[in-house]
């Protein structure tokens, strides 16, 4: 980047696998200023949530070990994207301006309503909070209980 030129502002919404990888890739260019927006302060290894629920692995990893020092982490939730104004509104009331936007919010698991009792008794493992819920339940189950 030359003298008075301002860096392009890149906002990445979503700090999962795709968002963290995109932020790290884009930051390698010296003409980009990268902001990563994620509702959690830690990266969640979704493929390890079953181990987290069983108490064998901590699936939450600090972003300081995953993203470059020059990536700004904003722990917040994007609530609105204004493509004309090139802004992202956050749940906190803050607004981020961008030149480029990467939308990498990932996926979520759902419990089918067509399965009787699933909503009340199933423990899905698609999200960190779900793994925490199952871990708490498993901690209450005696070791002798059948599973």
Q: What are the residue ranges of the model-derived segments?
A:
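Short beta-strands and strand-loop turn motifs
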Residues: 46, 146-147
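Beta1-alpha1 glycine-rich phosphate/pyrophosphate-binding loop at the start
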Residues: 2-72
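FAD-binding core/adjacent interface of flavoenzyme oxidoreductases
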Residues: 1-7, 72-146
